[in-house]
Amino acid sequence: MRLPQLKIQYIERWQKQHGKRLDHDERVRKRQAREGHKQSQDAQNLRGLRAKLYQQKRHKEKIQMRKRIKAQEEKNVKSSAPDEPSKTPLPQYLLDRSQATNAKALSSAIKDKRAEKAAKFAVPLPKVKGISEEEMFKVVDTGKKTHKKSWKRMITKPTFVGSDFTRRPVKYERFIRPMGLRYKKANVTHPELGVTVQLPILGVKKNPQNPLYTQLGVLTKGTIIEVNVSELGIVTTSGKVVWGKYAQITNTPENDGTVNAVLLV
């Protein structure tokens, strides 16, 4: 089963399978050349609410353009720090302080990437095997004497249940998550640092099998979870400590008895 993909990827998949038109590059060049004329025509001729919305859109685009130009100018400015590294040893968290201009450029690039809705996130496991409902749920028969009612389900896979979770009355509880299969911590590996740390799980962001499994907090292979990385001491460019980051489960927790994940950086 594939993880949810962005809608724009079907165009790329088509181009990989069937190729592009012979005049594709020429059409793209002409379309880009016409954009300025189209924007000018819309700005002059639109009326009413459409004109107001269009002006708001153009205003935001111009702000982003000015920010990008300013970031580029900051990137080109030479740093006042000396070219040769100092002989005095520095602790690990102060090594990047001398490269202020590079940090500004990197911060601007990250913000631009977040602003783009079509930004793609590379995950360690882009594909996972599907899990049937028969394998995921076990039917629990209920009924005072006959035990003929079979609307309850017991989850047979590991799950994460938050500390603020309160059970419903037993009579109305449809999905049962056994205490023995509940996990609160995961062994998270940082791909760049090459270290593995046991971190608390904050929540389940996305289970690729089914939105219902995401809501129930089921931990299967390929699930995106949020972990508490405050112990790692990761900080942003502004100096704030990063509290939570996403990680993807890479093992099969129900077979291994533990949750192993790779941090998404």
UniProtKB/Swiss-Prot annotation:
A motif (Nuclear localization signal 1) lies at residues 19-26. Belongs to the eukaryotic ribosomal protein eS8 family. Ribosome biogenesis protein NSA2 subfamily. Residues 55-69 have a biased composition (Basic residues). The gene is nsa2. One of its GO terms (cellular component) is preribosome, large subunit precursor. This is Ribosome biogenesis protein nsa2. It is found in: Nucleus, Nucleolus. Involved in the biogenesis of the 60S ribosomal subunit. May play a part in the quality control of pre-60S particles. InterPro entries: NSA2_fam, Ribosomal_Se8/biogenesis_NSA2. The lineage of its organism: Eukaryota, Fungi, Dikarya, Ascomycota, Pezizomycotina. Coiled coil: none annotated. It comes from the Eukaryota. Residues 17-91 are annotated as: Disordered. Component of the pre-66S ribosomal particle. Interacts with nop7 and rrp1. Interacts with rsa4 (via WD repeats). Residues 20-40 have a biased composition (Basic and acidic residues). Keywords: Nucleus, Ribonucleoprotein, Ribosome biogenesis, rRNA processing. It holds the Pfam family Ribosomal_S8e. Gene3D superfamilies: 2.40.10.310.
